[in-house]
Amino acid sequence: MYVLNLNLEKMKRKFINFKIPDGRVDINKIKKFNKKFILIDESYNANPLSMMSAIRNMNHYNRKKNQRKLVFLSDMLELGMKSKKLHRELAPIINRSDIDKVFVFGKYIKETFNYLSRNKKGKIFKNLKEAYDHFGKIIHNNDLLMIKGSNATGLNQFSKNIKKGQINVV
């Protein structure tokens, strides 16, 4: 820092109030649906690399007693003619992970769901309202839930609605 002639105190003051933008590895303790659970909000963007990374990162979260690892995924958009193939390629990564259940919403992410192991399959939702209405039944106390998808799918707003029950940021 000294070589670059940077003032550490000034830098510290700049970063003290830094908050990760919504939908980008935003980890929250949530109290909603009469349950307490952890939400990892990755809902702002999705491409093949970020989706694979987010899925693999779920393996690094230490599982607590009676905790399930759930993911809710939506489409990766703007992939063109390779969209189905790229969505399908996520399934083996999920199948090798310690994720318990996968829930999906969207046209292309069904390709992922169709290639999942039977024990990993949660549910395909027709729309986000249906998903929101069912989440109270799906979520258990202490669950770890990651939400990941392209912003244009509306998943970011879905995540914001869940966070309205937020206790505090982890």
Model-derived regions, located:
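ATP-dependent carboxylate-amine ligase
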Residues: M1-V170
